């Protein structure tokens, strides 16, 4: 599977163009209120903790995740799963982030990630919304819809 990070030149530009409109200043303006609302939720959470918290585990890992999930269109109910999968993917060398069990069991996180986003892609193809996942799911390159693997590469 190829991701934007692994692409160069024209291929990278072509895939980047699929979602770049979402990140143009006029569209970021529309996201600003939602991002501010999420930030206020986390400020309220800190206040409810009496002004003291473990900033990393209580705020720093959750706030950016919630913003990214909102942009993608991932429901908040899946937040714990998304954190777990994100930590397993990007912290795969960190023993604290790895699953227990055999090598096969520990690698199951990739299948869980792929299954989640394959289902999400299928849903957005059938029911497009106003989110980046819908843009990715319904993207066309060279006159052809992108395949599931190309779409999955975008989520990584």
What is each PLM-predicted segment?
Residues 1-156:
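Cytochrome P450
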């Amino acid at each position: 599977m190829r991701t934007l990070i692994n692409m160069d030149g024209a291929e990278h530009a072509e895939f980047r163009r699929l979602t770049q409109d979402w990140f143009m200043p006029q569209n970021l303006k529309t996201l600003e209120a939602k991002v501010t609302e999420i930030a206020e939720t986390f400020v309220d959470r800190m206040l409810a903790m009496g002004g003291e918290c473990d900033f990393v585990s209580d705020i720093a890992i959750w706030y950016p995740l919630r913003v990214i999930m909102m942009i993608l269109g991932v429901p908040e109910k899946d937040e714990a799963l998304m954190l777990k999968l994100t930590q397993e993917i990007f912290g795969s060398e960190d023993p604290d982030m790895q699953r227990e069990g055999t090598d096969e069991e520990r690698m199951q996180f990739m299948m869980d990630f792929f299954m989640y986003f394959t289902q999400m892609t299928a849903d957005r193809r059938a029911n497009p919304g106003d989110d980046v996942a819908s843009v990715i799911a319904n993207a066309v390159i060279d006159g052809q819809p992108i395949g599931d693997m190309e779409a999955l590469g975008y989520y990584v």
